[in-house]
Amino acid sequence: MAPRLEFEKPVIELQTKIAELKKFTQDSDMDLSAEIERLEDRLAKLQDDIYKNLKPWDRVQIARLADRPTTLDYIEHLFTDFFECHGDRAYGDDEAIVGGIAKFHGLPVTVIGHQRGKDTKENLVRNFGMPHPEGYRKALRLMKQADKFNRPIICFIDTKGAYPGRAAEERGQSEAIAKNLFEMAGLRVPVICIVIGEGGSGGALGLGVGNHLHMLENSTYSVISPEGAAALLWKDSSLAKKAAETMKITAPDLKELGIIDHMIKEVKGGAHHDVKLQASYMDETLKQSLKTLLKLSEEELVQQRYEKYKAIGKVSVEDQYIGVN
């Protein structure tokens, strides 16, 4: 098994050795159970040491993994009776955003999220999870429908950013995102947003104005990619690792800064190792959020959302700056 991430190399090597010993014991009469148990204990300790001390750049790499669970994966494990809706009723449908009606423990909800592909063919269909304007307009149509029928809205954020192509700009990409920000601020139903992978720039914000904002432990949320920031600040995109540490884009950092409400624990090694278990962690967070928000009146929901985002802009900086060489 080849390591997908450099910091996982010692883990993969030990897992491979354990697998080889288990196969050897099956093919021979030798009892190696004590040695296997010793290696498994060593593996557990090694995994704890690595995954409890991940650097920001490590988390960026995990968030970008092709087999990281997507919106549709979580919909399958968190909701029942999901009915997908298509189209923005103006131009067309956008496969980079999925959305529809579902039930969460019997409660009717509207679910919307960015959708990446897991291979080249699917990524071409999903445009690598980078929405066009019709994707954001489809999302807004579903949000207004939820507002009309008093259904809570749950948004999953997972995109490098909105698609920057010429056709998208011609169809009003910036206007579509801005309209979503404006309209989401005034929705009279609970809105819960969860960053499940990459939360990139305005493309993420287009689904990100909610009463509660949560992040998975190894997800990221930023105005620009580390590579882009490094190119702007230091004229060298190879300094992306340094930029990731400077930008404060990880869930632990953003929780400390008060940007997000809750960091959702991930299974050991990342959500891709056990999507069912990961969904159970998210299920508990969603239940707690809904329990809190459903107690609020329409006016209180709008006011709480307004105060939340108003507070994000309040910062105090004393003699701190990022040097540009």
UniProtKB/Swiss-Prot annotation:
> What GO CC annotations are associated with the protein?
acetyl-CoA carboxylase complex
Species of provenance: Bacillus subtilis (strain 168)
Question: Which biological pathway?
Answer: Lipid metabolism; malonyl-CoA biosynthesis; malonyl-CoA from acetyl-CoA: step 1/1
Protein name as catalogued: Acetyl-coenzyme A carboxylase carboxyl transferase subunit alpha
Which reactions does this protein catalyse?
N(6)-carboxybiotinyl-L-lysyl-[protein] + acetyl-CoA = N(6)-biotinyl-L-lysyl-[protein] + malonyl-CoA
The UniProt entry's sequence similarity note says: Belongs to the AccA family.
Where mainly located?
Answer: cytoplasm
Q: Tell me which UniProt keywords the record has, alphabetically.
A: Antibiotic resistance, ATP-binding, Cytoplasm, Fatty acid biosynthesis, Fatty acid metabolism, Lipid biosynthesis, Lipid metabolism, Nucleotide-binding, Transferase
What the entry lists under InterPro entries is as follows:
Acetyl_CoA_COase_a_su (IPR001095), ClpP/crotonase-like_dom_sf (IPR029045), COA_CT_C (IPR011763)
- State whether it acts alone or in a complex, and with which partners, per the record: Acetyl-CoA carboxylase is a heterohexamer composed of biotin carboxyl carrier protein (AccB), biotin carboxylase (AccC) and two subunits each of ACCase subunit alpha (AccA) and ACCase subunit beta (AccD).
Gene that this sequence comes from: accA
Give the EC number(s) under which this enzyme is classified. 2.1.3.15
* Cross-referenced PROSITE patterns: COA_CT_CTER
Extract the coiled-coil ranges from the record: none
What is the activity-regulation note?
Answer: Inhibited by pyrrolidine dione antibiotics moiramide B (CPD1) and CPD2.
Q: What does this protein do?
A: Component of the acetyl coenzyme A carboxylase (ACC) complex. First, biotin carboxylase catalyzes the carboxylation of biotin on its carrier protein (BCCP) and then the CO(2) group is transferred by the carboxyltransferase to acetyl-CoA to form malonyl-CoA.
Under the GO molecular function aspect, what terms does this record hold? acetyl-CoA carboxylase activity; ATP binding; carboxyl- or carbamoyltransferase activity
Its subcellular locations are:
Cytoplasm
GO BP annotations of the record are: fatty acid biosynthetic process; malonyl-CoA biosynthetic process; response to antibiotic
Where the record annotates domain CoA carboxyltransferase C-terminal, the positions are 38-292
Per the record, the domain of life is: Bacteria
